[in-house]
Design a protein with these regions (language model features):
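Carbohydrate transferase catalytic cores enriched for Leloir-type hexosyltransferases
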Residues: 1-339
């Protein structure tokens, strides 16, 4: 459905014909009616292609579809063309592009020929459910354990069920820990399904680990902190990145993080995570054993995670929004009249 909507509107000739016959497309007509002259898109959106007379800012969190062409969710069924057309056409026209790391800023500039001066870096922050978490409730923790049937020891992975998220890898890790190393360990997954979950479940059955895996959908914001806090670690063998929200949430809640060593990720998380090879499950199994048996290493990761959080000046970063607006207003004042 979204691809059809994209095809209907991305072509500039089609948009000009629509504008000629209907004066403006419905979206831009609504913006004019509401007297809105600047739009902020929180992610790549086909609606940015509708705008011909309205300024906009857009967030581009990653360009993974350019780096990992082997994953179907990024390249098959014309998804690559859809993503790339949206980003290529919107990034060069946006008055500002926002992303989450200097590495991604460089890639956006390189892939899409966007001036670096127009790309602003604003780091990820924990979700509101984590940021607003203050006091641990033992009663609520027990209630959540019962509600989700949480095992005694488990690794936690909050991620959509998609191939690039690498859930298959974690099932292999659990098998190594339980079968080869004789450690009792489970995994708790939570996230929305895009049609891939059934394959993951079948693989866990084939591997003999179905009883050691808990599959959840999205969970309530109030419950999310407890899924982190009751876990052994946040495990992220993902092939996307380098910026994702869960590591920041784990840093805030002081939960160890194991993360894929990909895409210059060390520039972002430095010494705050245990780096693993996303192709080799034994590297994560080794990391989990070290976290379980070496308190010094675990505390080092937790302390470094807190340092990364503290190093981000949230107020200074969000002030970049105001700088974008001030720059736009300053330029517009050179040609715009108030009468």
């Amino acid at each position: 459905e979204r691809h059809i909507a994209f095809l209907r509107n991305y072509d500039p000739t089609i948009r000009r014909l629509k504008k000629y016959f209907f004066f403006q497309n419905k979206f831009e007509k609504l913006l004019r009616k509401l007297k809105i002259d600047l739009v902020y898109f929180t992610g790549p959106s086909q609606y940015s292609l509708y705008l011909e007379d309205t300024d906009f800012i857009i967030t581009i969190p990653d360009v993974s579809h350019r780096e990992n062409l082997e994953f179907p969710e990024w390249t098959k069924s014309s998804e690559f063309q859809r993503r790339d057309e949206i980003i290529s056409k919107s990034s060069v026209k946006a008055i500002a592009v926002i992303t989450n790391a200097e590495i991604i800023k460089d890639k956006i500039s390189s892939f899409y020929s966007v001036e670096k001066e127009r790309i602003y870096v604003i780091n990820h922050r924990p979700s509101l459910g984590i940021s607003n978490f203050k006091n641990f409730s033992e009663d609520l923790s027990i209630e959540i354990k019962k509600k989700y049937n949480l095992p005694k020891k488990y690794i936690f992975y909050p991620a959509m069920y998609l191939p690039h998220k690498n859930h298959k890898y974690l099932i292999d890790v659990i098998k190594i820990l339980n079968t080869d190393l004789k450690l009792e360990m489970s995994a708790v997954f939570c996230g929305s399904d895009k049609g891939y979950l059934e394959k993951i479940k079948k693989y866990s059955e084939k591997s003999g680990q179905i009883n050691n895996i808990i599959f959840l959908d999205f969970v309530d914001d109030e419950h999310l902190p407890y899924l982190y806090l009751n876990s052994v670690a946040l495990t992220m063998p993902t092939f996307s990145g380098p910026t994702n929200i869960p590591p920041w949430e784990a840093f805030m809640l002081e939960v160890p993080v194991l993360y894929s060593d990909i895409h210059n990720i060390r520039e972002v998380y430095r010494d705050a995570v245990f780096y693993i090879d996303p192709f080799e499950p034994s590297t994560m199994a080794k990391g989990l054993v070290e976290i379980l048996t070496n308190n010094s290493k675990k505390n080092e990761l937790l302390n470094n995670g807190k340092k990364i959080l503290q190093s981000v000046d949230e107020k200074k970063e969000f002030n970049q929004f105001y700088e974008i607006l001030k720059k736009r207003r300053k330029i517009k004042n050179t040609w715009e009249f108030n009468n």
